[in-house]
Amino acid sequence: MLSLLLEREDAFLSGEEISRRLNCSRTAIWKHIKELRKEGYQIEARPKSGYRLVYRPDRVAPEELKPHLRTRSFGRRMQYQECVPSTQLLAHEWAKEGAEEGSLVITEEQTDGKGRMNRIWHSPPHSGIWMSLVLRPPIPVTEAPQLTLMASVAVTRTLRRETGLDVTIKWPNDLLVGGKKICGILTELRGEQDRVQYVVLGIGINVNVTPDFLPKELESIATSLAIEGGRTFQRPLLIAAILKELEEVYEGYLDHGFEPIRILWEEAAGMLGRIITAQTPEGPRRGEAVGLASSGALLLKTEEGTLPVYSSDIQI
């Protein structure tokens, strides 16, 4: 029903045409209309003219996303719920059941969203992109961290293009605007030593999050696209653009390896050439961030030489 109304945009669609195309009765049509109105859609009903969509709520439901998708597989199979504890958890369950590569779990709100190192990820309703994608790359487990960097490149390129904002990458999994975090990327996997079974790639983006929804302790370190851009953004369009770019960059990674990703990552990183402190398992290391190793490790130039940093919190 919604797809038909969206086709006509501001024009009326007759009950007769709806009945014919959906092969349903006028009574069934009215039930569909009432359900859509409950979900926040404003639909005008006019005698002898039919039905017209007047207002669409900001939702990331499949019927809002699919008309904009331009991918081969990413997002073509989708699980959507209004509110979930965590899209990562649902995606893991789906992957264990055999979900195909490109399967997407997406929601309007998370009540128990998680970031890197099991930190809380605040996911207020109807204001962000909270999604998890199932991947099945034919790579060894040791190369899986490269997928976080690959996704960082794809999302950064998309957000720069679609919003005009100067989005930069902070190793290993954050995207920043003006030094504040707007996106986090979380890569989790199941596999054996020589082969990844599946990867769940989680992406959380503060899109239309307002200052009221940012916890006090995050005000100085987090922001949103709307706050920085001074306007709101259509989340379905952003999601479709991200999935298209991500699919293309991912396929390029599988075909050509990590080196092209490494070059693109270094071009988009806002931390290279700066003095940083890396909190490593061996203790804090201070030095200049100079690039990425072929493995995806961050290269830190210190007084002792250039060191690869594999897992760390970074302070700039």
Residue ranges and their predicted role:
Residues 1-160, 233:
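N-terminal lobe of the biotin/lipoate ligase/transferase fold
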Residues 3-4, 15, 20-21, 101, ...:
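Catalytic beta-strand/loop module used to bind and position nucleotide/cofactor moieties
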